[in-house]
Amino acid sequence: MPVPTPLSEGTTPDTAAQELRTNRLWEALPGLSYGGDYIPNSGRNRSARKIYRSCRKPECRPSALASSPGLGLEPVEGSYDFTWLDEVMDNLAATGIKVALATATAAPPAGWLRKHPEILPVTAEGSTLGPARAHYLVVGMVLFCRPVCGEDDPRLGERYKDHPALALWHVDNELGCHVSEFYGPRRHRRFPSMAEPTLRHDRGPQRGLGTAFWSQRYSCFEEILTPRPAPTTLNPTQQLDFQRFSSWGLIDFYSMLARGHFARSHPRCPPRQIWWPQAPPCLWDYFDWAKKLECHRQWSLPGGRRYRCVTSELAFRRRSDSEAIAGGKPWSPDGALSPCRPCNWLASQHDSRTPGEMARNSLVHVGRGIWMLSCFSSGDRASRVRRNSTRPWCRTPEPTREYGVKLLSWAQAQSLVRGSRRRGGITHRNRLRLRTLVGKRTGLHPAPMWKYLELLRAFHAPCSCPASPPIWSIPALTLTAMTWWSSRPCTPSPMPRPAILRQRQNAEPQCSSATSVDIDENDAVRLGGYPGAFRDLLGVNVEEFHPLPENSTVSLDAGWSGRIWSEHVHLTGAEAKVSFTEAPLTGVPAVTRHAVGTGAAWYLATFPDATGLESLLDSLIAESGVRAPAMAAAGVELSRRSHADGRSYLFAINHNVTEAAVSAQGTELISGTPFNGTVPAGAVAVIAEG
């Protein structure tokens, strides 16, 4: 490799490189890692030199991760040029920066499109789409990914496996972000082969796909086609299987790269992947992905005026929620993209940051368990989609420098918190799986206002600051002293009713919403009456659904109002806590409670307004015994991380425009002084308690 380009007198290669070889590389990274997506135009250009010099300032953490994608490594098919990447990698190593090196598969060389047009995506209608900057190809095309980094020609892995800057392999980039469904002749042929073992386990395609109703009786598996536009309603189970097929295709592609030559060439350098927010068009099955990932990087952007406070964002986008997805086991460090300024493609829904918001939101993520912070874009580029993205080292450095100072101050105390986990709190047991979005895509919702992500935000918002931030979890996770929410509209549940009842006999209070368990894992209706699998547990029976017209509400005797949905509920052991006061459901229970074992199961026959959700949450918290990490003023988000030996650290994030009181004692780690009981406006306090 070429000698690193001299930056200035006194620059030396990274002397800690050999120490990183003794363990998993990210485990040796000191404290909090801070970096961003670095896409240089050239390793020698003026902007690159400015980046390197800026990174050496104390405001920027020397051990930060930088993503260096491999675009341009194959300018002509079969001809490789690593010169610029060698120079960039060497310069980053000389600066002390660790790199998450991309696998160069996010975009193919332009010449490949002429020879291999099959890598272009095909829509359900049969139209072939054209090329774009990246993420436009059909993943899984072995012929494309192997020439640079596959098993047959492992140039990238072999070349950089021992490079002192390497810390992570960044496998592809944002898989499934723009192309998550796979059509075309090859996919039509592969879909039946995927469906066969699944449907054989379910006693054949006739029962598995409900063909008696859908007039699709098959004589062989080869007759099963991928769902395409049709003049009438499509089979929802077949659509669900196709979504599984597409998600598994992404997983197979990732595994081929991550578990292939990269793992063999450097077993101590783990792979990672960026997760896109759980919203269409991305339909990943995150729980299947969790089995494959050792560390991941998750998009986390501020939600605009509707979700001004970061606490109203989906908790799933934070690190502790990834721990829950992993089944409660500790995960390896991951990187969350720190909220950026509004980009030209997000301006309609995202606001610019307020003073201190970047540091505040970043440490919110740290409080939830992450160890790596990444900014969305670093480095100036004249040609780019995101023309107004924020960079850690921008031309107006004061706010960013302040951010870097805060992170550096926190990183110096990071070793104290490292290894701790967030415990307790309220658990949202929503299976954020791809099938939860199928109903929305198929148009088979019982009410058009069931907007999955909007409902999750509504359930999440009131339980962020009052007590302990929520954790999203999976059905297999055992709960103790936690409140369980099920706000899944029409979400299939794989758990049979007897198993649910046995598992919950001694549980703490739980709460299920309307239509949460009415269908099974194959999107088929559970027979025997509603609310499906939870009917006996909840002590209610639903006679009839009463969907509400759009933008209308129904009055409740507690002073709340219900929206979207209502049901004619009969009590079969439960007691009515709130009832409807409007015809045709006057006097019919709207919120019920059923004592089960030492706990209780609550049921919502309508979707309460914000006041109702807060009141209901207060009741559930009081009944469950969940306690806030500390007493604090409204608008202060609290999270506690603890070690097994009892040491604990309280994160207090003040989202207010005025200072707020927090009842806690200990040393404030960022300032290094005793905590005085108040958190300044828009600031964060990290308190070593005791």
UniProtKB/Swiss-Prot annotation:
Activity at various pH: Optimum pH is 6.6. Maintains activity over a broad range of pH values from 6 to 9.
Hydrolase listed as a keyword: yes
Main enzyme class: hydrolase
Activity control, per UniProt: Activity stimulated by beta-mercaptoethanol.
Keywords tagged on the record: Glycosidase, Hydrolase
Catalytic activity: Hydrolysis of terminal non-reducing beta-D-galactose residues in beta-D-galactosides
Positions annotated to bind substrate: 173, 345
SUPFAM superfamilies reported in the protein's UniProt record: (Trans)glycosidases, Class I glutamine amidotransferase-like
EC assignment: 3.2.1.23
UniProt keyword ATP-binding present: no
Pfam family name, one: Glyco_hydro_42
Active site per database record: 174 (proton donor)
Domain of life (superkingdom): Bacteria
A molecular-function term among this protein's GO annotations: beta-galactosidase activity
Temperature dependence: Optimum temperature is 45-50 degrees Celsius. Activity declines rapidly above 50 degrees Celsius. Stable for at least 70 hours at temperatures 35 degrees Celsius and below. At 50 degrees Celsius loses all activity in less than 15 minutes.
GO BP annotations, alphabetical order: galactose metabolic process
Similarity section: Belongs to the glycosyl hydrolase 42 family.
Function: Highly specific towards beta-D-galactoside substrates. Hydrolyzes 5-bromo-4-chloro-3-indolyl-beta-D-galactopyranoside (X-Gal) and o-nitrophenyl-beta-D-galactopyranoside (ONPG). Has activity against p-nitrophenyl(pNP)-beta-D-galactoside, but not significantly at all towards pNP-alpha-D-galactoside, pNP-beta-D-glucoside, pNP-beta-D-mannoside, pNP-beta-L-fucoside, pNP-beta-D-xyloside, pNP-beta-L-arabinoside, pNP-beta-D-galuronide, pNP-beta-D-glucuronide, pNP-beta-D-lactoside or pNP-beta-D-cellobioside.
Protein name (Swiss-Prot/TrEMBL): Beta-galactosidase
Organism, scientific name: Arthrobacter sp
